[in-house]
């Protein structure tokens, strides 16, 4: 169901800019649009209204030779966005094609900020010299104000081709897609019952199992989904004595390093003597002495 304003917005009549000549450029060059007067903007601002573009028409009238080639690209940018995300809509058409471009806005903007809409053009793959006054542009804007913003049904940009030798197969235009949205849960105490609390802080008499997500709730103990997410949920019911893993590896290593094993000198000599004798007896072959006759 389309959202509607409780009170119809105050609509301005179409505000037309002059039909001015523009020089051919391979870089983005601004097309000057005529916006409501400063007095009108101040009046809307004092009434605490916001504004949107209901309809924007860009008229293109070429003035190049019949053998001119190339494409004209017209872009609408919203300067509230970062430079690489400001493009809202674009049109591409032959340089010799007289055409009207139509754009419908999908958002409001605040009159406390500079008007964010900018219109640019550039020419590519052309055999016409740069800085040649190749065409005339004229912009027409219809704006409206409202006490507050509402959801605006999307309307795609369109074109009206005025040159008979061209058709919609020679034209291309596009509109930016909706921004991607990803839900990000806020970790707070109010969500602790869902196992989404922040860093665990143990207090005297508490165990890690009773404070962590494996034992925070008993209301969903019979839920298969909850059991799959937290398979050790009820581990805290076993008691701290069962959950105690014992001394850590560092403690055991320190204890081993501190163990006292003492031997007297006589005991150490006896161990060495017996070890040497054992080696001699096991590895030396006894040779019978030869008698002299």
From Swiss-Prot:
Keywords annotated in UniProt: DNA-binding, Host cell membrane, Host endoplasmic reticulum, Host membrane, Host microsome, Membrane, Phosphoprotein, Transport, Viral movement protein
Q: Does the keyword Membrane apply?
A: yes
Pfam families tied to this protein: Gemini_BL1 (PF00845)
Q: Does the keyword Membrane apply?
A: yes
A GO molecular-function annotation: DNA binding
By its UniProt entry, which InterPro entries does this protein fall under? Gemini_BL
Instruction: Provide the protein's localization.
Output: Host cell membrane; Host microsome membrane; Host endoplasmic reticulum membrane
Which domain of life does the UniProt lineage start with? Viruses
Q: How is the protein altered post-translationally, as described in the entry? A: Phosphorylated.
Q: Which GO terms describe its biological process?
A: transport of virus in host, cell to cell
GO CC annotation terms, alphabetical: host cell endoplasmic reticulum membrane; host cell plasma membrane; membrane
State the annotated membrane topology for this chain: Peripheral membrane protein
Signal sequence annotation: none
How it assembles, according to the record, is: Binds to dimeric supercoiled plasmid DNA.
Q: What family does the entry list? A: Belongs to the begomovirus movement protein BC1 family.
Please explain the role this protein plays, according to its UniProt record.
Transports viral genome to neighboring plant cells directly through plasmosdesmata, without any budding. The movement protein allows efficient cell to cell propagation, by bypassing the host cell wall barrier. Begomovirus genome is shuttled out of nucleus by Nuclear shuttle protein (NSP) and the movement protein transports the DNA-NSP complex to cell plasmodesmata and facilitates further movement across the cell wall.
Q: What name appears for this protein in its UniProt entry?
A: Movement protein BC1
Which taxonomic lineage is given here? Viruses, Monodnaviria, Shotokuvirae, Cressdnaviricota, Repensiviricetes
